[in-house]
């Protein structure tokens, strides 16, 4: 295994270079802006390339030493991609809504996860002794908990690294990571504050093709970390149940 390759052309085809309207920018992003076209800021991909490469290395290194990566993206166009990418790389995700205290009040979250597991047991069996209405209420409770916590139910504690799409929308998640000293990899669009992020990646955080490309690369970096961890522990990768790798870079670029 090796870190995933990507090219400037793939970034261009995915629209990574398109920022927001110039009047919406955050002046702190000035070092990462190439210029503007039709009142839209153009992000400097010559900086994105090395910063993305560094972020991929951090993800791989974190997983290689047994760390957990939490993918966070709750906006409509990121939600499904975030979940799929995290699952494919045996990591964790929040893609519905960030609940306040999700990291800083882990004990309460753990109790809710235990409740989710209990509901799975109850509803997975015959669920005897419940009326139809009671069972329906339990199913609704389970569905609500699974939507909020399903992606972190097996995380077993706070993550070692967070990967975030849209730092403005996920500000609470970033604040909690800062309080706990959890490093953050994130896409920073032209309207974001890069100072909040440990490993920023300048790029479009709205276009679904761009989001798919980032998530594919981060996912494959995590898979590389798994392979390195197994290799260093002397495990036979051929005999182990490998995490499936999907060669979707081209597909992601095409949307």
UniProtKB/Swiss-Prot annotation:
Start and end residues of each stretch annotated as Disordered: 230-255
GO molecular function, a single term: structural constituent of ribosome
GO cellular component: cytosolic small ribosomal subunit
UniProt keyword Ribonucleoprotein, yes or no: yes
SUPFAM superfamilies: Ribosomal protein S2
A Pfam family: Ribosomal_S2
Disulfides per UniProt: none
Alphabetical GO biological process terms: translation
InterPro entries per the UniProt record, alphabetical: Ribosomal_uS2 (IPR001865), Ribosomal_uS2_bac/mit/plastid (IPR005706), Ribosomal_uS2_CS (IPR018130), Ribosomal_uS2_flav_dom_sf (IPR023591)
Keyword Ribonucleoprotein recorded: yes
Record's keyword terms, sorted: Ribonucleoprotein, Ribosomal protein
Alphabetized Gene3D superfamilies for the sequence: Glucose-6-phosphate isomerase like protein, domain 1, Helix hairpin bin
Residues in the signal sequence: none
PANTHER family: 30S RIBOSOMAL PROTEIN S2 PROKARYOTIC AND ORGANELLAR, SMALL RIBOSOMAL SUBUNIT PROTEIN US2M
Protein family per UniProt: Belongs to the universal ribosomal protein uS2 family.
The protein's name: Small ribosomal subunit protein uS2
Source organism of this protein record: Rhizobium etli (strain CIAT 652)
């Amino acid at each position: 295994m090796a870190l995933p390759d990507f090219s400037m052309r793939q970034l261009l085809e995915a629209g990574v270079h398109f920022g927001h309207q110039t009047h919406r920018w955050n002046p702190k992003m000035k070092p990462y802006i190439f210029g503007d076209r039709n009142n839209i800021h153009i992000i400097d991909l010559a900086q994105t390339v090395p910063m993305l490469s560094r972020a991929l290395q951090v993800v791989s290194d974190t997983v290689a030493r047994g760390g957990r990566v939490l993918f966070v993206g709750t906006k409509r166009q990121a939600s499904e991609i975030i979940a799929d990418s995290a699952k494919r790389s045996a990591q964790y995700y929040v893609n519905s809504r960030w609940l306040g205290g999700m990291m800083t009040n882990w004990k309460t979250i753990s109790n809710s996860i235990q409740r989710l597991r209990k509901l799975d047991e109850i509803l997975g069996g015959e669920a005897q002794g419940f009326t139809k209405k009671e069972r329906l209420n339990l199913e609704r409770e389970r569905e609500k908990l699974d939507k909020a916590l399903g992606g972190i139910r097996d995380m077993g504690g706070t993550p070692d690294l967070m990967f975030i799409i849209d730092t403005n929308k996920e500000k609470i998640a970033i604040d909690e990571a800062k309080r706990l000293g959890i490093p953050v990899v994130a896409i920073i669009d032209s309207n974001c504050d890069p100072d909040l992020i440990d490993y920023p990646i300048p790029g479009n955080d709205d276009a679904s093709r761009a989001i798919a490309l980032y998530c594919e690369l981060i996912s494959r970096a995590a898979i590389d970390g798994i392979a390195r961890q197994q290799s260093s522990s002397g495990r036979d990768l051929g005999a182990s149940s490998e995490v499936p790798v999907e060669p979707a870079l081209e597909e992601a670029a095409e949307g």
